[in-house]
UniProtKB/Swiss-Prot annotation:
Domain of life, source organism: Bacteria
GO cellular component terms given for this protein: cytoplasm
Upper lineage: Bacteria, Pseudomonadati, Pseudomonadota, Alphaproteobacteria, Hyphomicrobiales
SUPFAM superfamilies found in the cross-reference section: Nucleoside diphosphate kinase, NDK
The protein's name in its UniProt record: Nucleoside diphosphate kinase
Annotated residues for binding of ATP: 11, 59, 87, 93, 104, 114
Gene Ontology biological process terms, A to Z: CTP biosynthetic process; GTP biosynthetic process; UTP biosynthetic process
Pfam family, one: NDK
Coiled-coil portions: none
Length: 140
């Protein structure tokens, strides 16, 4: 597989518990490079746009509230087969079902506060990266 980029968010539960360094260590140990990273406070508008695909789902309001409840760390990750690799490293959405050694198994508190977001496809990664970064922000 080719070298590619994916998008990651370390969610408010990770920043609140001061575990972003530990999560980054897992990401880097998996062979992914963090080539762009910023700590931001996501606005309601940013969260609603980012999670627009879930707008009709019953958890949408709670998700937006959670994602705006504290700082997040937005990241661009790069590596071979980065999208699939990061999804594997994150683990299942429900931490109780996540494999040992994954970020969610190690750090997530619940399905709702599951520490990280990662793009589900290369196309979505490009769209998600563009919402928070421009090429000048990425040091490959």
């Amino acid at each position: 597989m080719a070298n590619e980029r994916t998008f990651s968010i370390l969610k408010p539960d990770a920043t609140r518990r001061n575990i972003t360094g530990a999560v980054n260590a897992v990401i880097e140990a998996a062979g992914l490079r963090i080539v762009g990273q910023r700590r931001i406070r996501m606005t309601r508008e940013q969260a609603e746009k980012f999670y627009e695909v879930h707008k009709e789902r019953p958890f949408f309001g709670e998700l937006v509230e959670f994602m705006t409840s504290g700082p997040v760390v937005v990241q661009v990750l790069e590596g071979e087969n980065a999208v699939a690799k990061y999804r594997e490293v994150m683990g299942a959405t429900n931490p109780a079902q996540a494999a040992d050694g994954t970020i969610r198994k190690q750090f997530a508190e619940s399905v709702g506060e599951n520490t990280v977001h990662g793009s589900d496809s290369a196309d979505n990664a490009r769209l998600e990266i563009a919402q928070f970064f421009n090429e000048a922000d990425i040091a490959a």
